[in-house]
Swiss-Prot record:
Family: Belongs to the ComB family.
Organism of this sequence: Gloeothece citriformis (strain PCC 7424)
Cited PANTHER family: 2-PHOSPHOSULFOLACTATE PHOSPHATASE-RELATED
Record-listed E.C. numbers: 3.1.3.71
Molecular function per GO: 2-phosphosulfolactate phosphatase activity; magnesium ion binding; sulfopyruvate decarboxylase activity
Catalysis performed (reactions): (2R)-O-phospho-3-sulfolactate + H2O = (2R)-3-sulfolactate + phosphate
Organism lineage string: Bacteria, Bacillati, Cyanobacteriota, Cyanophyceae, Oscillatoriophycideae
Hydrolase among keywords: yes
EC top class, as a word: hydrolase
Gene3D superfamilies per record: ComB-like
InterPro entries membership: ComB-like, ComB-like_sf
Annotated protein name in UniProt: Probable 2-phosphosulfolactate phosphatase
């Protein structure tokens, strides 16, 4: 298995795709996707465009759909939900399809949607993601951070490091594909016992604190608390594996 880390979709090779793409947006898209599927959502369908989200979701019965939209960390007023995983309770999402568009995470999913395997990872489901990689053993794996508007994101990098660290503990012969893997490992090993404090210091963490999303940060900083693997069944549509 050859492992690569890319901090944003824009930094990936333009002429290549991995056997398995692991998309990361800890604050908050992939955390929300994992939480929604764990709570019984039928599927999560991701869109980079809010207009496309509205158009496609309009073909679904209102009682079978939820629209989740976020721009700049804040809820889009035309949508039912924003991008908070804490809103995705069984009472709200069970049996429904979540149509979601966010500032960063949905763009990352779109970049790799034609990969053979696409899964969504966050700290909360890190162990389940690693278990899948150990079971399926794809030849090339991209850990793809979503970043923030094309720039580096501390929380996505530390999650990539957390996945790589656990994978290396359980699998011999993992080939390190780029220097970003080494940097992500070092970042995680420095902060692994104090991830929430790191989130408070990060630029997007500061942005969310300004929107009074303290509880979201606490939830998103937890490691290995959900046994759920969001996996793409068709481009842009993720289901529980």
């Amino acid at each position: 298995m050859k492992l690569f880390v890319y901090h944003t979709p824009e930094l990936t090779p333009t002429d290549d795709l991995p056997d398995c793409a692991v998309v990361i947006d800890v604050l908050r898209a992939t955390t929300t996707i994992a939480t929604a599927l764990n709570a019984g959502a039928e599927a999560v369908q991701a869109f980079s465009s809010l207009e496309q989200l509205m158009e496609v979701s309009e073909t679904w019965l209102p009682e079978k759909r939820l629209r989740a939209g976020e721009r700049g960390g804040a809820k889009v007023k035309e949508c039912d939900l924003g991008n908070s995983p804490l809103d995705c309770t069984p009472t709200v999402v069970e049996g429904k399809r979540l149509f979601i568009s966010t500032t960063n995470g949905t763009r990352a999913l779109q970049r790799v949607e034609h990969s053979q395997i696409v899964i969504a990872a966050a700290l909360i489901n890190r162990q389940t993601v690693v278990n899948y990689l150990l079971s399926e053993h794809p030849s090339t794996v991209w850990l793809l951070g979503s970043g923030w508007q094309g720039g580096y994101s501390l929380e996505d990098a530390v999650c990539a490091g957390a996945i790589a660290d656990l994978l290396l503990q359980h699998l011999e012969g993992v080939e390190i594909g780029n220097d970003e893997v080494i940097a992500a490992l070092a970042l995680y090993r420095q902060w692994q016992t104090n991830l929430l404090d790191m989130f408070y210091k990060s630029s997007h963490g500061q942005r969310l604190l300004g929107l009074n999303c303290h509880e979201d940060l606490k939830y998103c900083s937890q490691t290995d608390v959900l046994e759920v693997l969001p996996i793409q069944k068709e481009p842009g549509v993720l289901i529980k594996y």
